Amino acid sequence: MASTFGGEVRRSNGNAFIGVKKFVQTDGHTFNRFVWHHDQVTRPPNCATVVASSDYCQFASLEYNFPAFSVQYHPEFTKEYFKKLLMAGEGIFLSSKQTQRTLTEIKKDRVSRDADLKKVTELLSNNSQDRVRSVI
């Protein structure tokens, strides 16, 4: 989405980012989310404001000057779905040791989807639905 509206997205140098990562909103609020990707926003579009970042991803969440936002994590992944992805990708994307370590992280971390659902609700309630271009 960032690329579509004039930003820049590039493939990361190195391995994919897979696991549970901590993000920090511009107001200081922190949250954990599931990540599984190689690509990253390296320059946000002029029509977007950065609203969250992480130690590995400077532009983790963008809010646009129209009713939309984009994220560099997977708010749609449930814990069970993410575990299935990890197991299916064991030895392909991560070594067995990395997969087991990531599964252990998932057991310890609380990943809430509430903040994302709240943002979607705000976008749909504050703006007419036909003005919402996309929520990714």
Regions found by a protein language model. Give the residues of each.
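Amide-donor transfer/coupling interface in amidating biosynthetic enzymes
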Residues: R10, V24-I136
